[in-house]
Structure formats: structure tokens, C-alpha cells
Amino acid sequence: MRYLTAGESHGPQLTTIIEGLPSLLPITAEKINHDLKRRQGGHGRGRRMQIETDTVEIVAGVRHGQTLGSPVALVVANDDWKHWTKIMGAEPLAEDVNPEDIKRQISRPRPGHADLVGGMKYGHRDLRNVLERSSARETTVRVAVGSVAKALLNELGISIVAHVTEIVGIKADTSLVEGKTVDEIRAIVEADPCYCVDPVASAKMVDAIDEAKKAGDSIGGVVEVIVEGMPAGIGSYVHYDRKLDAKLAAAMLSINAFKGVEFGLGFEMARRKGSEVHDEIIWTEEEGYTRATNRLGGLEGGMSTGMPIVVRGVMKPIPTLYKPLQSVDIETKEPFKASVERSDSCAVPAASVVAEHVIAWEIATVILEQFHSDQLPQLKAQIDEHRQYTKGF
């Protein structure tokens, strides 16, 4: 299973084509739109989210609410396009038009963004050609793709949720998720302005975000994704590129501004002894093989153990600052303050939604690689058989 996305931040639309979905999978625009709305929310979003109302249009591969087995095409329109039709138009400029009047060219790259190196790589003197595609706006359609993947996982008894565990050093009490189902965690998260399970920490996060906004600065944080209902043995120890944790790490780091990833106890493992890290194996007739703890985050040897998968990612502060850092004009080579584009003071809550969906996509992809089927009922039967096998092993 694979997908491609196309579209610029201020272009007419974002488009994706998904190939490899089994037929007979229930999909509705309503469910995808719910996830798109979550991505637009969270305290700290900028003015762009006041302009856009992201909704998906399913234009191919689905009929009467079910996939056909052919490629699925999704489109999310950019409402702001009407203000950028001349600036971002695909057709060559007319001879009597002064390019400087409409292009809004950028020659002062922002530190920490793709602007300068992207311009070098693709030969763009106008750095807008870089930032329009490197913008996190592209994650809109990745959430739509992940929402489709979640629909598939839901049919297989696998559920997923993400929440914010830290913003600018303010840490949530993550023990509050213990003993709760994914649905229970989601209900708490969706009602919170920072998508956090800890209301005390969330209130402090809100204050910190507001302070950063007033200062023209930005702040980052940490998000956690929990996957419940995973069968054991998904992934492989045989080759490096089939390890499930490696694939999930790559997915997390593919999100704009994400710079680190960990599983289970994560980097805390470096400060513990082996007896305090590894999960003891137990067996019961009711559950089969399970673990006494879940310090490794549901992964051993590049494979799922059947315990909940727990993966965290760290997001750096957004590089677009309203009090910009020092940069250099690539045309004059003179020092200047970096260019300023509309941006968020903190996008960690929104990024947690993106993380949830890229992880969902990766897990769905690995499952379909391991249990390939052209139609959903056959896939469900294979998963059920696999679960019975691992339970009785």
C-alpha cells in the first residue's frame, strides 16, 4: 500500500492517491472530516486556521461508502487560494505583468526551515517555491490518508490515539492514561485545548503558549501515540528494513519539525538496569502470551508483542518567528532578519493528530504487507486466524 500527495500551501488544493486498499472497506467523508477538524484545533494555532475549513472530497475509488479496490483519490481544497490565484498560478505570467507586483518573492531564508537548502537543491532563487511545499499544510492530506488507514485498523480490532505529554518543559502526568482504553483517552483529549490528559498541566501549557505568542516566539513539545489491539508478530527481525519500530520511527520523523522518537521507556532505558527495562513474559489460558509490564512499548526484535505500542515524538519550536532571527539575503548576501510567514506559536497539539495518523498508516501498511488480501473480509479472516495461532503457540 502506498500514497502520493501533491499540492502547495497556497495552491488550489491538496491531492492524494492511495493505492493498495482492499475492497469493501467502509469509508465516509464525515469521519475523515472529523479528523481534519482535530488537526486544525489545539491551542496555539495561527490565523491560517481561521481562514481554512478543511473538508475532504472523495473523488475516486469509493462507491456508496465502500472502497472498490481501485486507487482512492482524496482532495482537500485550500480556501485561501482565492487570495493567491495570481501569486501561485500555474500559467506563465503575461508579458505586460510586472512579476514583482504579484510574486511575493522571498530571498531571506528562515533559520531552521527548508528555505535555504531547498533553494540550493532545486535551483530556486525565489524561496517561496520551497516553502510552499515544505509547509506543514501538506500534513492536512496526510491526516486524511491516515484516517482511511484508521478505518481499516478499526475493522481489524486495532485502535489508536495520540495525546500531548509535554510543551516547553511542562510535563503531563502520563500515569493518567493507565487503565484507560483508547476511546476513553480520546474523549479526554478531544475535550482539552492542548489535547492533553492532564488538566493541570494543560492549563500551564495554555499560559506558556500565550506567553510565547506575545513574545513573537514559538515553542515545541512531545506527543505520544498509543496503539491498542495489535496482534503479536507484526514486523520482522529478519531484515533491518522490515523492523516495525524502524518503520514507525521513520513515519514519526517524517512529520514537519519532528526531531526525535522513542518507544516505551525510551531514553530512560539508558538510566536503568536490564532487570528494570525488559518485560517479563507470562501466559494465561484466557489471553495466551502477554507481558507483566510494557516498558518496551509493545515491541521486541522489530516486531509487535501484542501489548499496546507506545511511541513518542519530539517537535521542535516552529522556525517561523514573528521576531525573526538573523539571516542573509541570498541575492545581496547582506545580513537581514528572516522572512515572516503566517504561522503558529505552538503546533504541538495539532502535530499529535498528525502523529496519530502517520502511525496508523504505517501499521496498516505493514499489516497488508504481511497479510495481503484484495478484499476486507478475507483480510479480517487472516488476522483472526493469526490471533488464534499466536494465542495457542
From Swiss-Prot:
It is an enzyme of class 4 (lyase). Its cofactor is FMNH2. The keyword Amino-acid biosynthesis applies. GO terms for molecular function: chorismate synthase activity; FMN binding. Keywords: Amino-acid biosynthesis, Aromatic amino acid biosynthesis, FAD, Flavoprotein, FMN, Lyase, NADP. InterPro entries: Chorismate_synth, Chorismate_synth_AroC_sf, Chorismate_synthase_CS. It catalyses: 5-O-(1-carboxyvinyl)-3-phosphoshikimate = chorismate + phosphate. SUPFAM superfamilies: Chorismate synthase, AroC. Pathway: Metabolic intermediate biosynthesis; chorismate biosynthesis; chorismate from D-erythrose 4-phosphate and phosphoenolpyruvate: step 7/7. The keyword Amino-acid biosynthesis applies. CDD domains: Chorismate_synthase (cd07304). Its EC number is 4.2.3.5. GO terms for biological process: amino acid biosynthetic process; aromatic amino acid family biosynthetic process; chorismate biosynthetic process. FMN binds at R133, S134, S135, N256, A257, G301, K316, P317, I318, P319, T320, R342. NADP(+) binds at R39, R45. One of its GO terms (cellular component) is cytosol. HAMAP family: Chorismate_synth (MF_00300). This reaction introduces a second double bond into the aromatic ring system. NCBIfam families: aroC, PRK05382.1. Belongs to the chorismate synthase family. This is Chorismate synthase.
